[in-house]
């Protein structure tokens, strides 16, 4: 029978229970050592140079800047900031969860992961709303496409993400376990009741609401284009690719992480068997790099969003043949009704 630990209980029993759970999850250290450093290394080796190139193209090659350009540039910046934290996590998990960089860096790296995660989610939501207005309400798009609106939206995203994630600097803790210094993530820190309610509010406001908005935006866009005059145009094909890519990022990368984070925190508050707790923690570990894989999806997004980006990339790497092919495709699309 499952018994909640939220109600007042004997303090020594509670501490004994938490210690037992820590012993359960300690069994995952070898799994983390084999899984997380490898996946994080792949993400870093692909994502860091990819986002560096993307930022360079947006800054030096893309002219004139449009609303989508500004949003994509900010998205690439937040991805790059996140990727710079990965070497610290790679070292941490490869060394058997032995944190050598101090308490400040522990909080900073954990804060950086969540700050850039939610910045990325909100930038993708802003981009989806801009696309929705341009396609569904074209008469309003002339004002909304002015770059000042994108600048305001991006500034708002940075501020909202900062405010939303700031409490983590107080909730995330580092500790010493079995002769090693551990940098705990949100789900493993100590103030469980506060963490539970903070996590629920954070998930509802900065993930569930954006997920609903993005889903409604793209289902409406596809429905409108399907029954509209441009049914067979390249415009619709591009919209379909964007829809599939954005929804994959949200439902494959972000959704499992948020669901399993809620379950992981709840499992620490409920009196459950060590075996179940171990399996929940293992599933949560698997979901964490999934959330980071959105950086791969974002790299594809830069290419899909703009033909100008494709041409600028080809110009940067001197791939003239591919550039000619993309120009031919663009001309073909523009000639379609």
Swiss-Prot record:
- Cytoplasmic compartment ranges equal 59-69, 138-151, 222-242, 306-337
Q: Which residues lie on this side of the membrane: Extracellular?
A: 1-37, 91-116, 173-200, 264-284
Cell compartment(s), UniProt: Cell membrane
Gene Ontology MF annotations:
G protein-coupled receptor activity; signaling receptor activity
Report the GO terms under cellular component: plasma membrane
The record gives the membrane topology as:
Multi-pass membrane protein
Extract the InterPro entries matched here: GPCR_Rhodpsn, GPCR_Rhodpsn_7TM
**How is expression of this protein distributed across tissues?**
Highly expressed in mast cells and is found predominantly in the tissues of the respiratory tract and kidneys.
**Which BP terms in the Gene Ontology apply to this protein?**
G protein-coupled receptor signaling pathway; phospholipase C-activating G protein-coupled receptor signaling pathway
Q: Where are the annotated glycans?
A: 23
Which residue windows are transmembrane per the record? 38-58, 70-90, 117-137, 152-172, 201-221, 243-263, 285-305
Report the main location listed first in the record.
membrane
- Key word Transcription present in the record? no
Q: Which UniProt keywords apply?
A: Cell membrane, Disulfide bond, G-protein coupled receptor, Glycoprotein, Immunity, Innate immunity, Membrane, Receptor, Transducer, Transmembrane, Transmembrane helix
- Please list the disulfide bridges: 106-183
Family annotation (Pfam families): 7tm_1 (PF00001)
Its biological purpose = G protein-coupled receptor for dicarboxylates and amino dicarboxylates. Receptor for itaconate, a metabolite produced by myeloid lineages. In the respiratory epithelium, couples the binding of itaconate to the activation of GNA11 and downstream intracellular Ca(2+) release, leading to mucocilliary clearance of airborne pathogens. Receptor for leukotriene E4 (LTE4) produced by mast cells upon allergic inflammation. Binds with high affinity to LTE4 and elicits mucin release from pulmonary epithelium in response to airborne fungi allergens. Regulates mucin-producing goblet cell homeostasis.
Family statement drawn from the similarity comment of this UniProt entry: Belongs to the G-protein coupled receptor 1 family.
| Protein known as | 2-oxoglutarate receptor 1
Gene name of the record: Oxgr1
